[in-house]
């Protein structure tokens, strides 16, 4: 994947403009609420029976922060995101058996949360496309062990 300097710079800069803990937690909450079948991967998290239960679940919040931290770490590896995520790809395919489509769902929810946090003047359609590309590369990289 070829990355333009403007794409990389904007993607990196976004994470200094948002509350990473809040956006990470909200992203995973959104995934679990809007795409309820994803809850099957989080049986050990306790009560996920309603949107309120999900939003008040500390394990969901903590895991959302962890997931976003892993996404942010990918900004240090633009030249080799696939290689960087190889171990996570193996874990998700071989041990956790996560449907690879859910990685795309996560990317969609993250872009929604970023748009809400940054506003339309900052998170323009062009910049949204940068993040779609970034999350598509991450999704593909995480799903590569499935092929």
UniProtKB/Swiss-Prot annotation:
InterPro entries: Globin, Globin-like_sf, Globin/Proto, Hemoglobin_b, Hemoglobin_oxygen_transport. Heme b binds at residues 63, 92. The keyword Heme applies. GO terms for molecular function: haptoglobin binding; heme binding; metal ion binding; organic acid binding; oxygen binding; oxygen carrier activity; peroxidase activity. Red blood cells. Residues 2-147 form the Globin domain. GO terms for cellular component: blood microparticle; haptoglobin-hemoglobin complex; hemoglobin complex. Keywords: Heme, Iron, Metal-binding, Oxygen transport, Transport. It comes from the Eukaryota. It holds the Pfam family Globin. Belongs to the globin family. This is Hemoglobin subunit beta. It comes from Lepidosiren paradoxus.
């Amino acid at each position: 994947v070829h990355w333009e300097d403007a794409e990389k710079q904007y993607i990196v800069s976004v994470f200094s403009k948002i509350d990473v803990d809040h956006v990470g937690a909200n992203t995973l909450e959104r995934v679990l609420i809007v795409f309820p079948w994803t809850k099957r991967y989080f049986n050990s998290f306790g009560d996920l029976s309603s949107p309120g239960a999900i939003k008040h679940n500390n394990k969901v919040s903590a895991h959302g922060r962890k997931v976003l931290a892993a996404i942010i770490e990918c900004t240090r590896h633009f030249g080799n995101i696939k290689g960087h995520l190889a171990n996570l790809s193996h874990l998700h395919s071989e041990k956790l058996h996560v449907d690879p489509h859910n990685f795309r769902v996560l990317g969609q929810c993250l872009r929604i949360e970023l748009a809400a946090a940054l506003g339309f003047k900052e998170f323009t359609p062009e910049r949204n496309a940068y993040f779609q590309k970034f999350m598509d590369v991450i999704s593909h990289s995480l799903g590569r062990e499935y092929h």
